[in-house]
Amino acid sequence: MTDPIKVFGNVGSPYTQKMLSLLRYRNIPYSVSWGDVVQNLSFLNIEPPKPVLLPTMVFKDDEGLDICRTDTTPIIRYLEELYEEKSVIPSSPILSFLNYLLEDFADEWTTKYMFHYRWYFNEDADNAKKMLVLQHKIDIDDESMNQFGDIIADRQINRLWVVGSNDDTAKLIDQSYKRYLSLMENHLKFLPFMFCLLYTSPSPRDLAR
């Protein structure tokens, strides 16, 4: 592939940041469009995926037609087939399995930390909603920003149960997060990557952390 990969994402999306980190590290050409994915795809007459997830990345199929992909884990493996340089998948089957396991942990569990700390506490939610509004439009008056922000915040706060964040689990999530930070801090004092004893470049697990 020679054409830049089209990435449609959100600044606040950890999965968008995960894939941008991968593309930058592997020197894979890409262009990124921020904001409303469906709207941005419509500008290019590209049919959005179902469901629309972040990021949405556009590739060419065998007939040269645009096709959207959204799940970061298989996208990373697909990119391994397209580009040979600076592979991020450990060649050892054992390390590859551990990488897959830890990447899944990062994607499915550590995102609970993000959603919890972003939307559970009122002060954090107030800050998050303003940042997300300004991502879509920076020339906006305070009243409109607050109205738009309240819509975003209500939607996200009402969905906290989806990631398991509530009054009963708040303490567990906080304890898990602090334990995770402690383990990562100890590991990174001696090694720059998760698997660098035998593998000297970042893995998808590193990109997802």
Task: Name these PLM-found stretches.
Residues 199-208:
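Conserved small/polar residues in nucleotide/adenosyl-binding loops
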Residues 115, 119-198:
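Extended alpha-helical scaffolds
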Residues 1-143, 194:
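GST-like domain detector, emphasizing the conserved glutathione-binding G-site
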